[in-house]
Design a protein with these regions (language model features):
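Outer/extracellular conduits and scaffolds centered on Gram-negative outer-membrane beta-barrels
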Residues: 1-262
Length: 262
């Protein structure tokens, strides 16, 4: 036909997903940072996917040139409906780096959140003034000017796992594809565009480069001569809070548009 439109709505439930969870200490396991042998696979999770898929096309002839335009739109929402134990959190993503203590997970599976949810400490720039330093040292007595400011989200005067918050997921809000095909006599032309919007990515390479003081950003980090910078000051301790994995500092917008084929 000259034109067409197709719309699909769906909902799919998956039960008893096979997931890797940490072996409890009561089982005699000794967890080792950066290793995986303290984890085992078991069926513990239920997942729900729901969304919409739209496909459309339009054919038209411009004299001797035949064309076809087609597009598709996909929006999928998923969330972990439940895990086997109430309030359980399954750590699902560790940055791919060598440093042992920096392998604190940044992605989790938790009831009510999407798959690949980033649950990390929120940061609020760097400590820039003596007044900010004095206030922040109530949370971290070892803090210095130029350090990242972690947010005490629950307001209890302490920084711990309870302060970690949901900061997006690697699941996109939607995906779009657009194709153009044209034919003139013995000549064919086609181009495909693809776009993703709303997904969050964790820049592990940036985190590693910061921790080893090899990232070009660090030239512009906070100093007394550059007092407005939100790039944290490099520290000699590679486990310093400025380069810890589990903060939103290394999260980035993963949206993009690209030409897939031409």
């Amino acid at each position: 036909g000259k034109a067409g439109l197709e719309i699909d709505l769906y909902e799919q439930d998956k039960e008893d997903m096979l997931l890797a969870i940490t072996t409890p200490i009561s089982a005699g396991s000794t967890p080792v940072n950066g290793e995986t042998y303290d984890r085992f696979l078991t069926n513990i999770g239920d997942l729900r996917n729901r969304g919409i898929e739209i496909n459309a096309y339009y054919n038209h002839e411009f004299g001797p040139v035949s064309t076809k335009f087609s597009a598709n739109f996909t929006k999928n929402e998923n969330k972990v409906v439940k895990l086997s134990r109430e309030g359980e959190v399954v750590f699902d993503g560790y940055p791919n780096i060598i440093r042992i203590n920096q392998t604190e997970p940044v992605a989790v599976l938790e009831a009510g959140l999407p798959v690949g949810a980033f649950k990390v400490y929120e940061t609020n720039g760097t400590i820039k003034t003596d007044e900010e330093l004095a206030a922040y040292q109530l949370l971290d007595p070892n803090a210095q000017k130029g350090d990242l400011k972690y947010v005490d989200t629950d307001g209890n005067g302490e920084l711990n796992n309870d302060d970690k918050v949901f900061k997006g997921s690697y699941q996109p809000d939607f995906e779009i594809g657009f194709n153009i095909d044209a034919n003139y006599k013995n000549f064919d032309f086609s181009v495909q565009f693809y776009a993703v919007s709303g997904n969050t990515i964790y820049n592990g390479q940036k985190q590693y480069a910061y921790s080893t003081k090899r990232h070009s950003d660090l030239v512009f980090s906070w100093t007394d001569d550059n007092p407005t910078s939100n790039i944290p000051t490099p520290r000699s301790n590679i486990e310093h809070p400025n380069v810890q994995t589990s903060t939103d500092y290394f999260l980035e917008d993963g949206s993009f548009i690209r030409v897939r084929n031409i």
